């Protein structure tokens, strides 16, 4: 079990008044605290096969993260202290099996699981957990030439990550207002085939 605390983080946050596009930029100095553990294993059950597995659980929280927004005599307060840090999953899983068909020919798979991540400071909006998958083959043709082929997102998973602009003061009861609205952000890489070669002299 590991405990980590980091103080004097500096953040320049754009705070948007709910229901409007008006925002103010605020400078915050805050702390982050987390506790968690990581378990890693390497398994070679038979010749040529190797499995690496890793599991991480963490719970990063804001501390002393407070800001006020004043507009037309109204004060909007945001206190994210005790909330889970946005964009950071609490659960991470890695599974990496591989098999050497011959001394020079290797096939491999890679699975990455990212748990639920919050998309705003109040933990009112979040993205569901998702898998990211990869696969490939590596062939050392000779001492001068190596070939490889890989597939990104071979399960064709779809999903988003990051934050949602303008949602800093959004409460959990108002989160439904973001349903069925187009928004910009980050997304999982689509199904992709990649080929490569390496030449050594």
What does each of the following model-derived ranges do?
Residues 11-26, 63-82, 161-184:
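Solvent-exposed loop segments that connect transmembrane elements
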Residues 50, 82-201:
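Conserved C-terminal beta-signal and adjacent last beta-strands/turns
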């Amino acid at each position: 079990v590991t405990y980590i605390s980091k103080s004097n983080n500096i953040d320049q946050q754009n705070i948007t008044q709910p229901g409007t596009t008006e925002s103010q930029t605020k400078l915050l100095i805050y702390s982050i605290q987390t506790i968690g553990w990581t378990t890693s294993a390497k398994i070679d059950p038979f010749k040529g096969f190797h499995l690496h597995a890793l599991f991480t659980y963490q719970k990063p929280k804001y501390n002393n993260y407070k800001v006020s927004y004043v507009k037309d005599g109204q004060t909007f307060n945001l206190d994210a202290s005790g909330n889970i840090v946005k964009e950071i999953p609490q659960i991470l899983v890695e599974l990496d099996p591989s098999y050497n068909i011959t001394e020079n020919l290797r096939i491999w798979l890679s699975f990455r699981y990212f748990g639920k991540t919050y998309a705003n400071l109040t933990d009112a909006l979040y993205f569901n957990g998702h898998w990211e998958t990869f696969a490939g083959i590596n062939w050392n043709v000779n001492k001068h030439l190596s070939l490889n082929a890989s597939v990104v997102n071979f399960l064709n998973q779809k999903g988003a990550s990051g934050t949602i602009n303008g949602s800093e003061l959004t409460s959990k009861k108002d989160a439904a207002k973001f349903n069925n609205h187009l928004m910009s952000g980050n997304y999982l890489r689509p199904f992709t085939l990649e080929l490569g070669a390496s030449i050594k002299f």
